[in-house]
Amino acid sequence: MPKVPETLAPRRTSRQIRVGKVLVGGDAPVSVQSMTTTPTTNINATLQQIAELTACGCDIVRVAVPNRDDAEVLPIIAKKSQIPVIADIHFQPNYVYAAIDAGCAAVRVNPGNIRKFDDQVGEIARRAKAADVSLRIGVNAGSLDRRLLEKYGKPTAEALVESAVWEASLFEEHDFHDFKISVKHNDPIVMVKAYRMLAERGDWPLHLGVTEAGPAFQGTIKSATAFGILLGEGIGDTIRVSLSAPPAEEVKVGLQILQSLNLRERKLEIVSCPSCGRAQVDVYKLAEDVTSGFEGMSVPLRVAVMGCVVNGPGEAREADLGVASGNGKGQIFVKGEVIKTVPESEIVATLIAEATRIAEDMADAGAPSPSGKPTVTVGR
């Protein structure tokens, strides 16, 4: 593998907290979160979705607790989940206490809509501390306190930060410090501004998120833009990509963002040209076929799928494994050396065979067993 480039900036120094078995902040890796979309009371469906999220690399999962029935099943969900569970609480402070008692790893509280929240802080802090449960102060543009909306006229970055800092100070007055903060907005520009301001105000670990980001394509672009800016500046300790899409897609996008910024080990990466009039092979289909064939592998390999002789040979030589196509044939490269030329119809099978061989060699040398799915990067 080529040497992994350095990150754009050193990580911001933040205090470290624990969310179950996952460390957040400090020198811990940036973690990826998602949220279940099933009714929490449907225990089997919720646990099945958590299992799917775990399998695709999710570190922490959040579940909704909109009513008493949801609160009552939290002990089962928390006990049987493979990854730490955060209870997402709005409106009812009693559900915060229920989540703490249920054994959830953490609780997200929304200071903008929990009844008389400031009056509840002392008791929440006491009980969370006794149970070794961390919190997230989750400030959201869509549910900002009325007083701040009147002061600023709308949910500005300044309003979000003022809310977060005020609530943080209340918890700290009660000697409770095991919390992270989020200041989410659906506008990436406002969101970035808010997190930059918040990062200057204290050493709290920060949970990044663009709220209500939208459908998969739009939400991916908005989240990648905002996260890329902040994480590139060293700001951010855990992320959640909010998409109107299956939760597993949120995790895949989040992991790809971290890998692209060298904040996670790069897994199987397929570099394919965007195609043009010079292409002598159907690059789109070839890249899709290679990706499908590599499903189930996540070894750290860079595989180049190139459609012509302009960038093809050079890009393929820079990859661990690659093909440069033309005239109905494909030159197969391994570590920069041409090992064979095969008919176009055999390109995919040959790449898969060589990738499998390399993966087996890595396993024999003590590398982790391949798992998960490859990612596709379209380049050039």
Swiss-Prot record:
Keywords, comma-separated and alphabetical: 4Fe-4S, Iron, Iron-sulfur, Isoprene biosynthesis, Metal-binding, Oxidoreductase
EC code(s) of this entry: 1.17.7.3
Residues that, per the record, bind [4Fe-4S] cluster: 273, 276, 308, 315
SUPFAM superfamilies tied to this protein: Dihydropteroate synthetase-like, Nitrite and sulphite reductase 4Fe-4S domain-like
Listed InterPro entries: Dihydropteroate_synth-like_sf (IPR011005), IspG_bac (IPR016425), IspG_bac-typ (IPR004588), NO2/SO3_Rdtase_4Fe4S_sf (IPR045854)
A matching Pfam family: GcpE
Cofactor: [4Fe-4S] cluster
Enzyme class: oxidoreductase
A GO BP annotation: terpenoid biosynthetic process
GO molecular function: 4 iron, 4 sulfur cluster binding; 4-hydroxy-3-methylbut-2-en-1-yl diphosphate synthase activity (ferredoxin); 4-hydroxy-3-methylbut-2-enyl-diphosphate synthase activity (flavodoxin); iron ion binding
Role description: Converts 2C-methyl-D-erythritol 2,4-cyclodiphosphate (ME-2,4cPP) into 1-hydroxy-2-methyl-2-(E)-butenyl 4-diphosphate.
HAMAP family associated with the record: IspG (MF_00159)
NCBIfam families per record: ispG_gcpE (TIGR00612), PRK00366.1 (NF001540)
Protein known as: 4-hydroxy-3-methylbut-2-en-1-yl diphosphate synthase (flavodoxin)
Organism from which the protein derives: Leifsonia xyli subsp. xyli (strain CTCB07)
